[in-house]
Amino acid sequence: MNETLITLERVSKVYQVGEENFTALNDVSLKVEKGAFMSFVGPSGSGKTTLLNLIGGLDRPTTGKVLFKGASLENMSREQLAAYRRENIGFIFQTYNLLPVYSVYENILFPLLLNGLKESHVRERVENMVAKVGLMDQINKKPAQLSGGQCQRVAIARALVKDPLLILADEPTANLDSENSHQILRLMQELNHEYKAAVIFSTHDEKVTRYIRREVRLEDGRVSWDESRNGAEIET
């Protein structure tokens, strides 16, 4: 039986917008196991990104609990939450969020430096990750010199290089054409299989559903569907 990484217990999130309250999540309960490859699916405003933010410790629920390996994020200080993100989670964003003045190599190296590691100790690890995402011939280029698909490959490598237990991918294919979207999804599927990091997508892209092994559908802040399945076979 797989280890449970994330547990949500009756989680709700309410935002105040002017004088009105907006309920982004309403009584959501679910678990995420180690090595999961899954997605939160739903239209804009359904609560997908809010759910990722709560799991990532970027926001706190209004009511309910978010637990990581049994420890409540609610009880963590800001410093502890920062350490939780730094040590356990890799983030992949729709807009890549690469540092424009850094090369491919330097962008992937950066989270390891934040974790207090010396470049001389991790250079081989970074170069291996660059090779894994097929960018060795671009290793010294800056983000402005790369295509959208290449930038997202850098973001994937940056998320994985610190060997996280969980990767949160917020609309990672939204800015890519169909061919690049499938390439990125196949790559993430292969890396999930190899590195065993759980991956959670937030998406409204139906292409993602071909690859994932579990789909959690959200409507109006509630879970309306939670289905496990066999994803597309990994190409060899």
Positions of PLM-derived features:
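ABC-family P-loop ATPase nucleotide-binding domain
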Residues: 1-14, 225-236
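H-loop (His-switch) and adjacent beta-strand-loop-beta switch element
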Residues: 215-228
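ABC family nucleotide-binding domain
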Residues: 4-211, 215-218
